[in-house]
């Protein structure tokens, strides 16, 4: 991965450095201001990855079990869970290997570790791109279901949804390979940052438009039923709060990582940017947190999916 400063790479574990513990420190910087550096222990990475892994496996299992959930919308949610699952698997795998190398329980040559590191980087990058794409696909699906409700089933068909899903996975794999191969090229980094900004703008426009339509619909109902205006205001505030949470989580979890990529291009040698580079591990942890939050926002709010999830858990016991 193209990072500067502190970074989680398997090759660094061959030096058998002591494992990190969670801490907030002001790292001295002789050429600039003091840097606030958040140290993330490997155990925390492992714990976050395992929680995300369990959550997203349950989402995939529930959707696979219930035939009522075999629709384009839930297929997009399932693919988002698979993307987050890959983020978790790559994180757990990398952390476990790093801990084994540091403890001396695993002996490996540098060349083998380098190849494993490259594979994990491809997994991480591909899952990040696919996760962003499926978040956009879910937003588009919801938008069409609201604004083109009568034509929804003719527009969003299963064959069309499968083609979109296949295209996203192929594009994600190709993007990750290009990113890992040409990560030191400025154009590649800028394209990734531009892709994130485009996804953020797309989601913001679609969800704001959906909120406006929902508020208009609430006004129409209130007018027909001759209700008072405060009811509409309460609905609007609730919708605005939901929208703020949805977009806020997306921006807070993904924004720092892409800010990191932007600063690599804009100011790789500046002391202030160097302070931000030191917190790369924190940015990765936030992405893993997003993989934990996604099922809560997009999957577990469905009553049908929650019911199926209870059946899956009962069967497992």
Curated annotation (Swiss-Prot):
Gene3D superfamilies: Rhodopsin 7-helix transmembrane proteins
Extracellular side, ranges: 1-37, 94-118, 184-191, 267-279
Compartment list: Cell membrane
Membrane topology (UniProt): Multi-pass membrane protein
Residues spanning the membrane: 38-63, 73-93, 119-140, 164-183, 192-211, 241-266, 280-300
Residues carrying sugar: 29
Gene Ontology cellular component list: plasma membrane
Signal peptide residues on this chain, from the entry's feature table: none
Residue spans, topological domain Cytoplasmic: 64-72, 141-163, 212-240, 301-317
GO molecular function ontology, one term from the record: melanocyte-stimulating hormone receptor activity
Record bears the keyword Cytoplasm: no
Lipidation (S-palmitoyl cysteine): 315
SUPFAM superfamilies given in the database record: Family A G protein-coupled receptor-like (SSF81321)
Keywords for the protein's UniProt record, in alphabetical order: Cell membrane, G-protein coupled receptor, Glycoprotein, Lipoprotein, Membrane, Palmitate, Receptor, Transducer, Transmembrane, Transmembrane helix
Function: Receptor for MSH (alpha, beta and gamma) and ACTH. The activity of this receptor is mediated by G proteins which activate adenylate cyclase. Mediates melanogenesis, the production of eumelanin (black/brown) and phaeomelanin (red/yellow), via regulation of cAMP signaling in melanocytes.
Subunit structure: Interacts with MGRN1, but does not undergo MGRN1-mediated ubiquitination; this interaction competes with GNAS-binding and thus inhibits agonist-induced cAMP production. Interacts with OPN3; the interaction results in a decrease in MC1R-mediated cAMP signaling and ultimately a decrease in melanin production in melanocytes.
Family the UniProt entry places it in: Belongs to the G-protein coupled receptor 1 family.
Annotated protein name in UniProt: Melanocyte-stimulating hormone receptor
Organism listed in the record: Alces alces alces
Gene from which this protein is expressed: MC1R
């Amino acid at each position: 991965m193209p990072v500067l400063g502190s970074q989680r790479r398997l090759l660094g574990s061959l030096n058998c450095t002591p494992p990190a513990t969670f801490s907030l420190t002001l790292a001295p910087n002789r050429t600039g201001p003091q840097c606030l550096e958040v140290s993330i222990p490997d155990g925390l990475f492992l714990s976050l990855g395992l929680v995300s892994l369990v959550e997203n496996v349950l989402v995939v299992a529930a959707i696979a079990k219930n035939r009522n959930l075999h629709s384009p919308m839930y297929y997009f949610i399932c693919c988002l869970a698979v993307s987050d699952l890959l983020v978790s698997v790559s994180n757990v795998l990398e952390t476990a290997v790093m801990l084994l190398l540091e403890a001396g329980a695993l002996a490996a040559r540098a060349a083998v570790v380098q190849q494993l590191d490259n594979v994990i980087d491809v997994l991480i990058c591909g899952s990040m791109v696919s996760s962003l794409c499926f978040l956009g696909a879910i937003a588009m699906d919801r938008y069409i279901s609201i604004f083109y409700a009568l034509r929804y089933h003719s527009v969003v068909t299963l064959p069309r949804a499968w083609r979109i899903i296949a295209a996203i996975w192929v594009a994600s794999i190709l993007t990750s390979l290009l990113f890992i191969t040409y990560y030191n090229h400025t154009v590649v980094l800028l394209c990734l940052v531009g892709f994130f900004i485009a996804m953020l703008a797309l989601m913001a426009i679609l969800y704001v438009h959906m909120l406006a339509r929902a508020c208009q619909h609430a006004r129409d109902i209130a007018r027909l039923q001759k209700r008072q205006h405060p009811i509409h205001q309460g609905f609007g505030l609730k919708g605005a709060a939901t929208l703020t949470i949805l977009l806020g989580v997306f921006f807070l979890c993904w924004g720092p990582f892409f800010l990191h990529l932007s600063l690599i291009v804009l100011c790789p040698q500046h002391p202030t940017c160097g302070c931000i580079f030191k917190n790369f591990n924190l940015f990765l942890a936030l992405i893993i947190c997003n993989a934990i939050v996604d099922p809560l926002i997009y999957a577990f709010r469905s009553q049908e999916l929650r019911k199926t999830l209870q059946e899956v858990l009962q069967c497992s016991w």
